[in-house]
Amino acid sequence: MPDYVNWLRHASPYINAHRDCTFVVMLPGDGVEHPNFGNIVHDLVLLHSLGVRLVLVHGSRPQIESRLADRGLTPHYHRGMRITDAATLDCVIDAVGALRLAIEARLSMDIAASPMQGSRLRVASGNLVTARPIGVLEGVDYHHTGEVRRVDRKGISRLLDERSIVLLSPLGYSPTGEIFNLACEDVATRAAIELGADKLLLFGAEPGLLDADGRLVRELRPQQVAPHLQRLGSDYQGELLDAAAEACKGGVARSHIVSYAEDGALLTELFTRGGGGTLVSQEQFEVVREATIEDVGGLLELISPLEEQGILVRRSREVLEREIEQFSVVEREGMIIACAALYPIADSEAGELACLAVNPEYRHGGRGDELLERIESRARQMGLSTLFVLTTRTAHWFRERGFAPSGVERLPAARASLYNYQRNSKIFEKPL
C-alpha cells in the first residue's frame, strides 16, 4: 500500500476537525526570505482549500534592515524593540509594502501552478489593525514604534466568511492617521485572541522550542513557560514562546511553534497525532481513566500487534467487552495509546497486573509508570496486598520497579491452575 494512502487515512480525522476553524499564522521576515517559503505558501493554500479560515501575519525585520543599510542608516534598538524615527519609518513602509505585494503575488502564483488551478483565491488586506505609540520608556523615545490597540474583528470575520485569506502586515494606523511600526508577533497574538481563533501557528528557525540540551519540547502549558523564558533571555525562541503562551491565556485553544526551514512542518504539526513542533495549550493533552465499552476498538488496535508478536496473550473482542471494567487506559486526542488491566485473584488478597501496553510512538513519556501507579492504587483500594505479573519479554522493566522474581508455587491456587507452561512466562510479585 502506498505511504500516502496510509497517511491520508490517519489525517482524515484532522481534516474534518480543522474545517471551518480559524487559524492565525505568523511568518517572520526570515521565513519569507527562506528557500522553503514557496512550500509554506503551497501548504497554506492547501489548508485554505480544506476549509480552514486563514489569517496570515508576516514580519519584515531583515527586509527593513536591508533598506536601512541601502540608505546608510544605523538601526537602533532598546529592550529588543526597534526605535522607529522618521527616516526609519520610510524604510519600514517601503519594506512592508513591497513584501505584502510579493506575498500576495506568490499566493496567486501558487494556486495557478497547483492542482487547484482554476479555483478562486482572494487575498484581502487593509487598515485592519489600529495601533498606538509605545511612547517613552526608561527615557527612550520610540517615535513611530507602536503596539496593537485593536484588531478589526468584524471586518476580518467578514472577509473570512467570504473565503478570503486575510493578510496582516506589521503596520498599524491611529485614528489621527499616523502609521506605526509593529512587532508581527504582537499583531498575530492580538489577532488570534480578538478573533477567538482556534489556533495560533508561529514559524521560527528551529523545529520548535528546544530545551537546554537542544531537545525538542513537544508540549507544555502556559504555566510551564516562565523557566524557559528566563533561560532563553532575548533569544527569538523566547519571543515565540511568550506569544504562544499569551495567546493561550487570552483564550486561544492551542498555539504551535514550527520551523519555516523544514518542508512540510506545518502539515506535520496539524495532521499527525505526534506533530512535529511545540504545542502550547491550556487543554489536558492526555487523560488516564478507567476504560469503557467504547474503548474496545481502540484497545484491539493497540494490543493486536503485540499479540501477534507473542508479547501479550490473545484477547478476542468478546473477552475485552466482558473484562473491560478491569482496564485502565491513557487517551490522547480520542486515541487509546496505552492500557493496563487489574484482575483480582479469587479467594486471595492478590491481584494480577496484565496487558500493560504502550503505543510504540509514545514509549518514552513515562506512561507505563503512570499506568502501573494507577493499577497499584486501584489494588490497594480493593484491599489487595500483593500484585503479580506474568511476562515473557519485559522482566527487567518490572524488576526496576520493585517486582521480585517469584514462581508458580507462589501464585494463589485460582491463578496457578491457569498457568500456561507452554508459554513459560516469568512470574514476579510486589507487596503493596
From Swiss-Prot:
Tell me its EC number(s), please. Answer: 2.3.1.1
At the top level, the lineage of the source is Bacteria
Give the main EC class: transferase
Q: Which InterPro entries match?
A: AceGlu_kinase-like_sf, Acyl_CoA_acyltransferase, Asp/Glu/Uridylate_kinase, GNAT_dom, NAGS_kin, NH2A_AcTrfase
Localization in the cell: Cytoplasm
What's the protein called, per UniProt? Amino-acid acetyltransferase
A GO CC term? cytoplasm
Q: Could you mention a single GO BP entry for this protein?
A: L-arginine biosynthetic process
Looking at the record, the residues that make up the N-acetyltransferase domain are: 286-432
* Reaction(s) catalysed (UniProt annotation): L-glutamate + acetyl-CoA = N-acetyl-L-glutamate + CoA + H(+)
Matches recorded under HAMAP family: N_acetyl_glu_synth (MF_01105)
Metabolic or biological pathway, per its Swiss-Prot or TrEMBL entry: Amino-acid biosynthesis; L-arginine biosynthesis; N(2)-acetyl-L-ornithine from L-glutamate: step 1/4
Say which family it is in. Belongs to the acetyltransferase family. ArgA subfamily.
Q: Does the keyword Amino-acid biosynthesis apply?
A: yes
What is the scientific name of the source organism? Pseudomonas putida (strain ATCC 47054 / DSM 6125 / CFBP 8728 / NCIMB 11950 / KT2440)
Molecular-function annotations in GO: L-glutamate N-acetyltransferase activity
Query: Major location, coarse class?
Result: cytoplasm
The UniProt keywords, alphabetically, are: Acyltransferase, Amino-acid biosynthesis, Arginine biosynthesis, Cytoplasm, Transferase
Its lineage opens with: Bacteria, Pseudomonadati, Pseudomonadota, Gammaproteobacteria, Pseudomonadales
